């Protein structure tokens, strides 16, 4: 993984609270264990009027022409609640989402997003309101998420955010759980070479 330092992108404003993982990726699409291919099913029951994903719902914000190509998702509190399915961040990442901004995220979803190199940014409700107003009033509005400086830049303003230092390190350096383990590959090899024969 390449790591996340700064990203500037088009924002799609999903004005909904308590969006659960079943809404993000419905259960009928959870049959694969590969991370790829889930983007087309993202918010399926909201994005489409049919069961097979061929009739877009013109009322759903992500289908609006002005938000096509969005790479930052703006939402309300408790985003990603519900079951712990990792397919939810897989679907968002496969769709092209690089960062999410909301007042709060469900804990397991928050961790799973970081493991998949997406930055979940927690801002206050007032700050999120301001960004909603900016994005909805300005077609093509872009926002910058700067993980090195721990700020979001929008409409000439800077909004500071906090993130655990270990998780920030993983995001900046593109490290998932496997990558973290491989950082200690030499020590693992040394340990394995010294295991007594009766334990091997």
UniProtKB/Swiss-Prot annotation:
Q: Which GO terms describe its molecular function?
A: 3-isopropylmalate dehydratase activity
In terms of InterPro entries, this protein maps to: 3-IsopropMal_deHydase_ssu, Aconitase/3IPM_dehydase_swvl, AconitaseA/IPMdHydase_ssu_swvl, IPMI_Swivel, LeuD
Q: Name one GO cellular component term.
A: 3-isopropylmalate dehydratase complex
Biological processes, Gene Ontology terms: L-leucine biosynthetic process
Keyword Lyase recorded:
yes
**Which pathway does the record list?**
Amino-acid biosynthesis; L-leucine biosynthesis; L-leucine from 3-methyl-2-oxobutanoate: step 2/4
UniProt keywords (A-Z) are: Amino-acid biosynthesis, Branched-chain amino acid biosynthesis, Leucine biosynthesis, Lyase
Asked if the Swiss-Prot or TrEMBL record annotates the protein with the keyword Signal, the reply is no
Pfam family, any one: Aconitase_C
Record field: catalytic activity = (2R,3S)-3-isopropylmalate = (2S)-2-isopropylmalate
Q: Which PANTHER family match?
A: 3-ISOPROPYLMALATE DEHYDRATASE SMALL SUBUNIT, 3-ISOPROPYLMALATE DEHYDRATASE SMALL SUBUNIT 2-RELATED-RELATED
- Description of how the protein assembles with itself and partners: Heterodimer of LeuC and LeuD.
Instruction: State the family it belongs to.
Output: Belongs to the LeuD family. LeuD type 1 subfamily.
Record function comment? Catalyzes the isomerization between 2-isopropylmalate and 3-isopropylmalate, via the formation of 2-isopropylmaleate.
Please identify the protein, giving its name as recorded.
3-isopropylmalate dehydratase small subunit
Species per Swiss-Prot/TrEMBL record:
Vibrio campbellii (strain ATCC BAA-1116)
